[in-house]
């Protein structure tokens, strides 16, 4: 097992132990009631692991949704409980928080509850507020007329982002009256099954502009062959290490890279050489994971759109993504190549955005 996978599961287990000990101490309840609270907490976290180990496709769709949302939300709640108790422990060491506040304390318990409810009510409400990001690029006359493109990434449709959410997003997009819709991967979350049962493809077919997309890492997790069938039903043209030239849009060229999950994918330089420069006026690359941006710049790409990072989704994970990626969010430029790394319109795991924003991007080429 890769080291990151070990850390991914080990850290929450350590956090659960730390939080469980604090919850046991702080609750002003009898042993029986404290035991029940701890068992409930462990059960919620165990669902997170169980979802990964056993999968959800064998469970009825309503129950699968409950298991996914409870299990994955518990991971974020655990993160913030850990941080809160660390702050309280530090306060106790500095004699700013009395020890009685953390032991059999009504005031301590109510304070922790109020802080957590406040954080996650805000985080959930903020998630549903989709930001419209306006981006304008001057092509110096390389496109015959102004073009409007709506771009999004990381939809993560499935057990927690159902058809009703996609319907809202389609309404946002159609209201823009775009010439083109571009999606930078992770359309599907962990399984194509809920998309098939809900006929989510019907919502994509409501889009009033051609749709082009590249694959993300989650398309591989969900079973790439089944995902490809869904894309065909939805009317999405998936560009997998291929380019398409659009003469009806002034010979705009869209290049879609396979996800870096595939170690044998073509380089961006190879893809740029696959078409004649005389037949393109402007090139846009869709590449889900924003690694090695310098290679796109060296290959002469005009604009690259990526996602994957979610900008950490919640603070302070956004600090980690900043450390990992050359650009983990927003606009960026290398030489003459422009980049935009999106935080995503959807979300993985719990539906919380804390310190980050869900968004879709409206790009105008002029």
Protein language model features and the residues they cover:
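Short N-terminal secondary-structure initiator segments
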Residues: 1-9, 125-135, 193-197, 201, ...
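Generic structural motif recognizing short loop/turn segments at the entrances and edges of beta-strands
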Residues: 35, 131-135, 250
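Alpha-helical membrane-embedding segments
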Residues: 64-73, 95-109, 132-145, 165-178
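Hydrophobic alpha-helical transmembrane segments in integral membrane proteins
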Residues: 116-142, 158-164
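Soluble catalytic domains of enzymes that build or remodel membrane lipids, polysaccharides, and related
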Residues: 138-366
